[in-house]
Amino acid sequence: MEYLSIGSPEKKYRLVILTDMENEPDDSQTMVRLLMYSNEIDIEGLIAVTSKWLPRLVFPESITARVNAYGVVRKNLVKHAAGWPSEQYLLDRVAGGQRGYGMSAVGDGKSTEGSELIIKAVDKEDSRPIWFAINAGANTLAQALWDVRKTRSPEEVAAFVKKVKVYDDSGQDDAGAWIAHTFPDLFYIRSRSQVFVLDAPMTAYRRIVMDVKQAI
């Protein structure tokens, strides 16, 4: 089993974040926290997407604002550790995803800056896989996979899918189920309990224990 070791100088993990910024304060808070660890990972995308409670709007400008704030303090961060990405590097990886909810916003002619950024990141000449942390809806990743499946050979699709690893927080639209069903070889983890940690830690703990027992 492979374990993710934060801070390992030999190997940084590649990461794309899908987040429904402006839905709730926790999305902005976790974005700030991520930036405080951005020297430990290779951030490949910061994509504003929709979710159940934010079904029609995306706010990439809110990600941009947090990256701008990171740029202000970066000069202090570099005094303590190496590897901090430049503000411009991160800004170049901010994008907006599907402006609609779930699979209703996925299909031919529905590509977005976010879905195109995903394809570009996965296609990069880099043998490392990309982890997708989906803290909202998954339909922007679904759109990227839709476009790849429509335009490439089965062998090329398989090579693309092999590089994608997903951690999905609670399945906040129907796109995650479509991805898992359509691409059964794609590495996909769904947490059914993470979101409950926000306001009921003990409830979340009990749910996690139940999930583990069911898995065993």
Q: What is each stretch, according to the model?
A:
Residues 2-216:
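N-terminal acidic, glycine/proline-rich low-complexity segments
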